Amino acid sequence: MPRKKAAAAAWEEPSSGNGTARAGPRKRGGPAGRKRERPERCSSSSGGGSSGDEDGLELDGAPGGGKRAARPATAGKAGGAAVVITEPEHTKERVKLEGSKCKGQLLIFGATNWDLIGRKEVPKQQAAYRNLGQNLWGPHRYGCLAGVRVRTVVSGSCAAHSLLITTEGKLWSWGRNEKGQLGHGDTKRVEAPRLIEGLSHEVIVSAACGRNHTLALTETGSVFAFGENKMGQLGLGNQTDAVPSPAQIMYNGQPITKMACGAEFSMIMDCKGNLYSFGCPEYGQLGHNSDGKFIARAQRIEYDCELVPRRVAIFIEKTKDGQILPVPNVVVRDVACGANHTLVLDSQKRVFSWGFGGYGRLGHAEQKDEMVPRLVKLFDFPGRGASQIYAGYTCSFAVSEVGGLFFWGATNTSRESTMYPKAVQDLCGWRIRSLACGKSSIIVAADESTISWGPSPTFGELGYGDHKPKSSTAAQEVKTLDGIFSEQVAMGYSHSLVIARDESETEKEKIKKLPEYNPRTL
């Protein structure tokens, strides 16, 4: 199986682990630097979940190729006005979204020295926090959450921060906060879950975490964003280093029902099944047939970031002989993002993937980056469709409609990659209820059990307990959670979060026996 060379992989993975450095002399697209003029092209509408004008994308030959469809300049670029998606009030749906039906107590295990996660050492400006937080090798409960019932936990494969939504729909956050991604109005690290005051008047139904940014969705379908906005990943129409308080994104279309965040980009889906993306276009992960790359002055490479949500207008399939055909009438039902790739599940149970192709994470049996959503062939057969999708840092998962779990990409990037979807034999016959991926570890709630695996080094996110093996290449039951029913699992870069059901007295007793974690604070 071909494997991405280390040198090539360096293009994607941060060289210093701090999430900004990249190989080569490239500069990340910032507000500085003159944007070069691009020739206008005719546009025609095609694909997508509903009508509405949108850039037609040229599909002569392979998509991408650095081409981009012409469009009006976005705010902050050449002084043009941002093109904000707007739906007239009388045709706008009125929705009241429901949050998850789960109820339980939050458990955490893994790395909790938030500023050290994914880095060799704590940065100088965070030096005071150097010795705060430890690796929790088994499940713990937070002392400060006694009596708080949780319905959703959220983190991300690139994230060193976490969120929880209470049964009342209130959003709490904690962890790394260098860019204000916790939404508390400052950039101070927070050791244990704390209510986001700026959203206390809203009922939050779901949320998503990028590397240093956060999106929150209200019950009426509005989206609030906070954290890093250097690449426009907050969708506020500008590029700024940090936005520490929740701000509503520049979008006035149909209500949003689903969201996902990659490392430095975001995806939102409306109630009609249209998909919109914004942020860093570097590997084509926004799906607009371009990687947004251009040469600025002094031969510097910069990126033309999308600063407001823009519709993903075209979906394609490639035939065996290399022909590219548009796939019309795609109605999106779910979306998931890895560090630099995106997966979509549509109403016909088909899966599309695009963005960074390294390690085979797109499932197209090749490592090419894809600039527009491309059909993953395996799930395009009657009875073979997908029912759930999940994206890891460098891998992808799907659960088929008959319940089989499929995997492609790589969790351990120093070993063989899986270039197309393959059944996960270890979990054959298990009913997958919830799955989450960290940087290289996986955790699954299946039937009555919790299962995890991941290569070394790990930091406790597998939950096997003290004095037990720290890593496992094969799926293993998490024995420390025996008798505890996991309603939902979530994973950050190297920590795990579980909602433990606490309906019966026996369940409450089991949870009570777990150690309490009361982190030291400054």
Curated annotation (Swiss-Prot):
A GO MF annotation of the entry reads:
RNA binding
Positions bearing Phosphoserine: 16, 43-46, 50-51
RCC1 repeat positions:
103-165, 168-219, 221-271, 273-347, 348-401, 403-447, 448-501
Q: Which residues carry this modification: N6-acetyllysine?
A: 92, 124, 293, 377
Comp. bias intervals (Low complexity): 71-82
Q: How does it sit in the membrane?
A: Peripheral membrane protein
**Which keywords does this chain's UniProt record carry?**
Acetylation, Cell cycle, Cell division, Cell membrane, Centromere, Chromosome, Cytoplasm, Cytoskeleton, Guanine-nucleotide releasing factor, Membrane, Microtubule, Mitosis, Nucleus, Phosphoprotein, Repeat
The segments labelled Required for interaction with RAC1 in the record are 318-325
GO CC term, one of those recorded: early endosome membrane
Residues of the region (Disordered) are 1-83, 502-522
Q: Per the record, where are the segments of Basic residues compositional bias?
A: 24-36
InterPro entries noted in UniProt: RCC1/BLIP-II, RCC2, Reg_chr_condens
GO biological process, alphabetically ordered: cell division; chromosome passenger complex localization to kinetochore; establishment of protein localization; focal adhesion assembly; integrin-mediated signaling pathway; negative regulation of focal adhesion assembly; negative regulation of GTPase activity; negative regulation of substrate adhesion-dependent cell spreading
- Where does this one sit in the cell? Nucleus, Nucleolus; Nucleus; Cytoplasm, Cytoskeleton; Chromosome, Centromere
Induction line: Induced by TP53/p53 in response to oxidative stress and DNA damage.
| In-chain residues carrying the UniProt-annotated modification Phosphothreonine | 20, 342
User: Where this protein primarily resides, as one coarse class?
Assistant: nucleus
Gene3D superfamilies in the cross-refs: Regulator of chromosome condensation 1/beta-lactamase-inhibitor protein II
* Comp. bias (Basic and acidic residues): 502-515
So what does mutating residue 439 to E actually do? Answer: Loss of interaction with RAC1 and loss of regulation of RAC1 activation
UniProt subunit comment: Interacts with RAC1. Interacts with nucleotide-free and with GDP and GTP-bound forms of RAC1, with a slight preference for GDP-bound RAC1. Binds preferentially to the nucleotide-free form of RAC1. Interacts with CORO1C. Interacts with microtubules.
| Known role | Multifunctional protein that may affect its functions by regulating the activity of small GTPases, such as RAC1 and RALA. Required for normal progress through the cell cycle, both during interphase and during mitosis. Required for the presence of normal levels of MAD2L1, AURKB and BIRC5 on inner centromeres during mitosis, and for normal attachment of kinetochores to mitotic spindles. Required for normal organization of the microtubule cytoskeleton in interphase cells. Functions as guanine nucleotide exchange factor (GEF) for RALA.
- What is the designated name of this protein? Protein RCC2
